[in-house]
Amino acid sequence: MDVMVLEGDGIGPEIMSSSLKIMDVLRENYDLKINPIRYDIGAKTADEGKWTLEKILEAADPYKAILKAPMGDPKLVGESGTEKALDIILGLRFHFDLYANVRPVRLLPGIASVLRGIDDKNSIDYTIVRENSEGLYSSHFGGMVLRDSVAIDNQIVTREGTERIVDMAFNLAEKSKGALSSGKRSVTCVDKSNVLKSFAFFRKVFDEVAEKHPHVERQYMYGDAMTQYMLLHPRNLNVIVTENMFGDILSDLGASTVGGLGFAYSANLSMKKGMFEPVHGSAVDIAGKGIANPIAMILSMGMMIDWLGFSKDRLVLEEAMFSAIRKDTKTPDMGGGAKTAAFTEQIISELLNNS
């Protein structure tokens, strides 16, 4: 099976290279039947005119799965002042209707949390399901500035969009082991229904969909309150479902509790297509230094492997990574001194020893 690989910008090509080296080992020594097709696509190549959004979408169309490295460069902005990379990222999401952004918040073995009382024995493991096709971010291609005096962006919440994202959240909860503190399966609706009609509608549809999932508990929390709850009681959480921008913000906060964005991985899903990517950016300030943490990229690849039906290979991959971390082969952001290449080679060594 062919998958599309987008190499991105900044540290993107470096951490993608690490991931694909590991994929090669899985292909040669395990059961993985995936063939990566690499494309030098990112904000830089788009800015240089090598790739237009239309050409990128056309190239991506035949693939069921896309593995995407971080894209973007703060220096590359369009006339509106927004980064050019967003045209590619949001273009892919909207064009292929990748409506569900699934972002696990998971503390890996051997990684320290900034939260008191959280460790390997009292860990963190929940999932944020972010509506990915509407909400406030749907204004990216349609916001306006009037007479250089007023800027307007609109939030869009539809019944169809809300029903399908909430249904996915409940389905994930049903398949999960529940909250770490209690084992209870639950979905928490995060909104500002006390202020905005769009969020009140989101909650109304949430309740309607919840009726179809009687074995999963429903919970509610306002977006501002959830920022505190995620820090104080993360082990009580199972699945969170929320609007586009709230999901973006909350998942970054969640990442800070499990080691940082270097450990934040994600999937953008529709019924027929998936795009898998780290949550973090392209970190152009450390590009080329060989010190980037590739874990989020590798775990995103693991999500893709699992989604394509190779769940055993994902488990093998993750166990090899955990072994590498336990042996203190850590990049600087993890408190170690290893280079990206050394960490990658340690994972490969673990895979080969267990094959």
Q: Where do the language-model regions lie?
A:
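Glycine-rich phosphate/diphosphate-binding loop of Rossmann-like nucleotide-binding domains
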Residues: 4-21, 25-27, 147-222
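Buried hydrophobic positions in well-ordered alpha/beta secondary-structure cores of metabolic enzymes
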Residues: 9-12, 64, 129, 169, ...
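Buried hydrophobic packing segments
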Residues: 19, 23, 297-305, 347
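N-terminal beta-loop-helix "entrance" segment that forms/cooperates
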Residues: 31-54, 230
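Flexible, glycine/charged-enriched surface loops at secondary-structure junctions
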Residues: 31-35, 177-190, 213-221, 310-318, ...
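Glycine-rich phosphate/nucleotide-binding loop
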Residues: 43-45, 104, 229-329
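N-terminal glycine-rich phosphate/adenylate-binding segment common to multiple enzyme folds
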Residues: 46-152, 245
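Accessory "access/gating" subregions that flank catalytic or transport cores
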Residues: 194-205, 209-253, 257-262, 351, ...
